[in-house]
Amino acid sequence: MKATLLKHLMALGLASHCALALSTATGPKPAPVDCSKTPGTQSELNACAFQDFEAATAADNTAYKTLSQSVGNKQRQLLRQVQTEWIQYRVKACEFEKSGVEGGSIAPMINWQCQARMTRERTAELQRFLNCQEGDLSCVRQPR
């Protein structure tokens, strides 16, 4: 019973990937903006940074799901734990990065740019595990 509850709580933590990031002190989710046009206001810049973060998160979620499905149960549990803790780290690291402009209208943009950048870096790490070559001793799955 306790193990099942723990599994559900860990799954909930990963399912709320975006929600955890949104829980930072940057306010509500910005309204969608056409970022193909040059944004004219700080609010539009903030919204475009958030949209970039959402795109980075979608790619990260895809890589995570693919890797999770390609490893055994023990590795899947470890991956879930690592990903949950990484999300918490990313949020705190970006809070630190934006602390110099906290309270300013640019703070949300700095936060979302940081989170998008870190998420793309994490996606690259997950992709490395997905595409490891034979002989790579850090490979956690069977090489292709």
PLM region descriptions:
Residues L22-R144:
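N-terminal alpha-helical modules
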Residues S16-C18:
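N-terminal signal peptide c-region/cleavage motif recognized by signal peptidases
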Residues M1-L12:
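Bacterial N-terminal signal peptides that target proteins for export
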